[in-house]
Amino acid sequence: MFIGRKTELESLSSAFATSRASISVVFGRRRVGKSSLIERAGRGTKFFAFEGLENQPQSAQKKIFIEQLRAQGCAVSSARNQSWYELLSNLRLLINPTEVTVILLDELQWLANYRSELISALKLVWDQILSKHSNLKLVLCGSVASFMVRKVIRSRALYGRCDLTLNLQPFKLAEAKEMLPGKLHEETLLAYLLVGGIPKYLSLLTDKDSVLRSLAFHCQGINAYFSSEYQRIFLSHFGDNPHYEKVARFLCGKSYGANRSEIVENLSLPNSGQLTEILENLEYAGVIHSFVPFTEKSSSRTKRFHLVDNFIRFYLTFLEPLVLGGALERTDFLSQVFNTPKMSSWLGISFELTCLNHISEIAQVLGFAAVRYQAGPYFRHGSTSEGDGAQLDLVYKRGDMVCTVCEVKYQNGPIGISVAKRLDEAISKVKELKNKTVQKVLIGKDPTSNKLEDGVNFSRVLSIDEIM
């Protein structure tokens, strides 16, 4: 069953329905569902797929490309030392003159060995041969966002030739709910907090009668999926560059994120273009996300970076210590991992990050989605020249002169009146809010006490299931 991706599916289907040849580019992190989306949009067409090999030399890539051409009906030469121009020219043999023909080049970064040679050859083949066939719809797909952006989308070779670009994101809560049919709201939310919105991960959490038992099953054992997925993520996205993992590990321990200067200082990295590239690539891959405080204008200096990949956070905090200690297989997950104060605290942070991942959905429920806004968390260290420290979970600086300040609480049972008092105190420390109309909103997972529901302390009490 195909779930979600309505907007992306419509965009890709429209690209396939055009009356001329077109190039679409689809990228996103591994296991996010790129190939499934393309195959779904290509239903009813003549569909041909080619895929690169991970960590193989150019000779192996060309050999497998020839084999895939032959497997799909092309009688092509197997001569050695053929150029990419010669090999890609064979794609014309697949084009049906009377039917829409979709050709997918999947895991393009592997097929190209992360170099520009294939892309340059593709430009010539496209201009001289493929673009002449109006029924052809070429899709370039990859899981290494940095390559897809820099070598494909922004390349001089394909400049102005890409008709559609899709950066496929993990599922939101509403789609995760569809992935877990029959699960109650609270269990669906727990699954999302633990592994995020990656479709493959969510599908594994349906193997047992509960999300927690399914997760434990896929974490324990030598061949357990989740116990080795962390290494696969960093190897497939970032190769053997250790700085990517260092940044992720550092941010994992920062509940309020960190700015560029703090990353440089703590990791002893040069404050250079290399760091800019590392941060951009991590953000392209959905591992981290940057927010600019509503009090500042956007710049690299004011951005705060947060580790927003829930699975990576879960692995580094809970799984890795067990793996390194050799205790993974003999650990009772329910009692030693899940039912612990450390997990409760961790889930609270994960809930805050999940709300940051649903900024537009929250704005929609609150009724101001049509208003221009800048949104994100706010954090200021204590005892600075600007005043005492302050932290706000989520702030919308709206174009209608209102600031919506959200307090996010992941808590079992009623939320006490003290929450409202702490928020008032935090707001009073932010001078930029003193002359603003402030709308206070409480976002929680459980019913709150009557005192908080009466509208005196908060103008709106929002339950997370309202955006599911």
Regions found by a protein language model. Name each.
Residues 1-337:
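Phosphate-binding site recognition
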Residues 294, 303-468:
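A cross-kingdom feature that marks ATP-driven nucleic-acid transaction machinery
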